[in-house]
Amino acid sequence: MSDEETEQVEEQYEEEEEAQEEEVQEEAPEPEEVQEEEKPRPKLTAPKIPEGEKVDFDDIQKKRQNKDLMELQALIDSHFEARKKEEEELIALKERIEKRRAERAEQQRIRAEKERERQNRLAEEKARREEEDAKRRAEDDLKKKKALSSMGANYSSYLAKADQKRGKKQTAREMKKKILAERRKPLNIDHLSDDKLRDKAKELWDTLYQLETDKFEFGEKLKRQKYDITTLRSRIDQAQKHSKKAGATAKGKVGGRWK
């Protein structure tokens, strides 16, 4: 017998049982009424079984049990599958967290290393600049010492040569320069300390700078004066040319006729 036929027989059997139960409930006496005589019990009839076929109720029961077991097993499998999936997701989440933590630690390490390198580089550059500044100051001090040492000798020799050329034709300014050169003491800076020598060099440097500034201003003033003189001479020449032309025109025309 096939599964469909077995199910049909089973459903027919259940329907007949339900019909018999309903008949028994309808025929049952009400509790308030007392029946003196018992009514005959209804006769239960077995479900009709198709002729030529035999129904195996054990097989039906076994199939029901197998079906229930399969459904239960499916529920169990789905439960364990969902639990396994949750565990896998939890493991993956933990791995991502650990990976992110490791990446963050690596980034912090790289950032700290770069910061150390930057600080070391800044310190090296600062030390190099300080060394270069000290070297440059030492060179400047040495140049100033040489310039100051040679300044007096050069200035004195210059005045001596000028005196020899001019001889007795010295002006008041030349006499003043000569007197100042004679009164000027030689520059003795060997006994000075570094600080005093630096101050002395600064003082002389400021004086020299002021002299150069005055020289530049006098030169510019002289240029302006030369330019003014040249412009004035040019204007005078132009005026003289125009006056000569006007005089020649007046001489050539007499009585309304040309000579």
UniProtKB/Swiss-Prot annotation:
Q: Which GO terms describe its cellular component?
A: troponin complex
Q: Which SUPFAM superfamilies match?
A: Troponin coil-coiled subunits
Modification Phosphotyrosine occurs at: Y209
- For this chain's UniProt record, which GO biological process terms are given? muscle contraction; regulation of striated muscle contraction; skeletal muscle contraction
Q: Which GO terms describe its molecular function?
A: calcium-dependent protein binding; tropomyosin binding; troponin C binding; troponin I binding; troponin T binding
Spell out which residues are annotated as carrying Phosphoserine.
Answer: S2, S78, S149, S156, S157, S193
- Where does the record place the modification N-acetylserine? S2
Residue ranges, compositional bias (Acidic residues): 1-36
Q: Which UniProt keywords apply?
A: Acetylation, Muscle protein, Phosphoprotein
The UniProt regions of compositional bias labelled Basic and acidic residues, in chain numbering, are 50-62, 101-143, 171-180
Disordered: annotated span: 1-62, 101-180, 235-259
Origin: domain of life: Eukaryota
Provide the function of this protein: Troponin T is the tropomyosin-binding subunit of troponin, the thin filament regulatory complex which confers calcium-sensitivity to striated muscle actomyosin ATPase activity.
Q: Which family does it belong to?
A: Belongs to the troponin T family.
Name of this chain's protein: Troponin T, fast skeletal muscle
